[in-house]
């Protein structure tokens, strides 16, 4: 089996839109190969942040040598269609032999930080609270850094003060760059990191280049913080070759992602991709409609809709399909088990299509 490297270049990424049916793949892999992707965060590249990642991150106190050259190249050379999403996605990648009706099994083998910093943004009233940002601001971007503390990767951010966009404008006007947040400063807060990719998806069966923002049965912007190293993601295939893509790297995210983004930061990702016949998948997991996660301890079903109540309902129905079709329950007993033993959590409440996921203990159901 091979390791195929997929860098972030203007010819290997899409900015703001998903691949569509008929798009030419930027790479091809065989089932069982590992895709090594230099994923790139969109934060620091966006127009409201100056579309100048070199200057933007210098203004936060980041050394020039620690600012990614591919970020600068994408900002300068790639097209970002007006009205599209913010995300940079690598792909599409052809998975040889994958055809509609099959499922991809994507093992998340490794997620390594490419940088030691990231950004959390609240923009355009699109978080959970439409009243935020305050004081007429369209966007607030908060800088955070990654440090090693007591053997663990930790995020550090300030509690108060100017945001990263203010720091950038001060720097452009000739002011000094901001100082990096330090763990011994009482005006900072520390929190644990758990790197994951917010976007892993397959190409939907449409000729339209959809926005990267809403997720779907094809995966995409799922923003489920369980998509960490050691998790397997299953996705249904809709077009020949699957058209796999990935992006939206995070250092950390709370369930709900309430401010709109979480700690967005670039990662190198190793994804091993396999193909499963639809009939084999159905025998094991039932007639699911959309993404399924498998962690060491849980099977995680997913649901999406414009409103959280409907997303929860969708997720419950997917969970019932798993238990009834794949695990021998009848519908009444499956519903009772879910009520007693499964946790339904908000994946995200900010991506147009709201997301809910359910964690079902594998030990309970013999999986």
Task: Say what each PLM segment does.
Residues 1-9, 367:
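Basic/polar N-terminal segments that are highly enriched at the extreme N-terminus
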Residues 29, 95-98, 227:
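Short, well-ordered loop/turn sites that connect or cap secondary structure elements
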Residues 66-115:
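Long, hydrophobic/aromatic-enriched structural stretches that serve as scaffold segments
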Residues 103-285, 293-295, 317, 324, ...:
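Glycine-rich anion/phosphate-binding loop at the beta-strand->alpha-helix junction
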Residues 287-306, 316-320:
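Extended amphipathic ligand-handling, pore-lining, and cofactor/metal-binding catalytic surfaces
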Residues 310-314, 321, 325:
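Extended C-terminal subregions enriched in glycine
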């Amino acid at each position: 089996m091979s390791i195929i490297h997929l860098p972030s270049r203007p010819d290997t990424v899409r900015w703001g839109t998903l691949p569509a049916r008929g798009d030419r793949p930027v790479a091809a892999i065989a089932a069982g190969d590992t895709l090594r992707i230099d994923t790139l965060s969109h934060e620091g590249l966006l127009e409201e942040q100056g579309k100048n990642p070199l200057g933007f991150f210098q203004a936060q106190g980041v050394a020039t040598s620690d600012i990614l050259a591919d970020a600068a190249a994408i900002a300068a050379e790639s097209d970002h269609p007006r009205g599209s999403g913010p995300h940079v996605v690598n792909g599409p990648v052809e998975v040889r032999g994958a055809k509609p009706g099959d499922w991809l099994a994507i093992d998340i083998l490794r997620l390594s930080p490419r940088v030691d910093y990231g950004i959390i943004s609240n923009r355009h009233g699109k978080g959970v609270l439409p009243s935020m940002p305050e004081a007429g601001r369209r966007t607030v971007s908060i800088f955070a850094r990654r440090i090693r503390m007591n053997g663990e990767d930790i995020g550090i951010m300030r509690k108060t003060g100017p945001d990263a966009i203010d720091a950038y404008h001060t720097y452009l006007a000739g002011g000094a760059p901001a100082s990096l947040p330090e763990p011994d400063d009482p005006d900072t807060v520390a929190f644990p990191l758990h790197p994951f990719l917010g976007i892993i998806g397959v190409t939907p069966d449409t000729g339209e280049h959809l926005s990267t923002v809403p997720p779907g049965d094809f995966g995409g912007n799922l923003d489920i913080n369980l998509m960490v190293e050691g998790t397997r993601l299953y996705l249904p295939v809709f077009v020949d070759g699957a058209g796999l893509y990935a992006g939206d790297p995070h250092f950390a995210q709370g369930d709900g992602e309430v401010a709109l983004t979480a700690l967005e930061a670039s990662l190198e990702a190793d994804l091993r991709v396999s193909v499963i016949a639809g009939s084999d998948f159905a025998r094991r997991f039932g007639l699911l409609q959309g993404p399924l996660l498998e962690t060491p301890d849980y099977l995680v079903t997913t649901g999406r809709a414009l409103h959280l109540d409907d997303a929860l309902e969708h997720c419950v129905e997917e969970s019932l399909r798993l238990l009834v079709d794949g695990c021998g329950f009848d519908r009444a007993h499956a519903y009772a088990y879910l009520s007693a033993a499964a946790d339904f959590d908000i994946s995200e409440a900010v991506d147009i299509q709201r997301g809910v996921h359910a964690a079902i203990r594998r030990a309970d159901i013999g999986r």
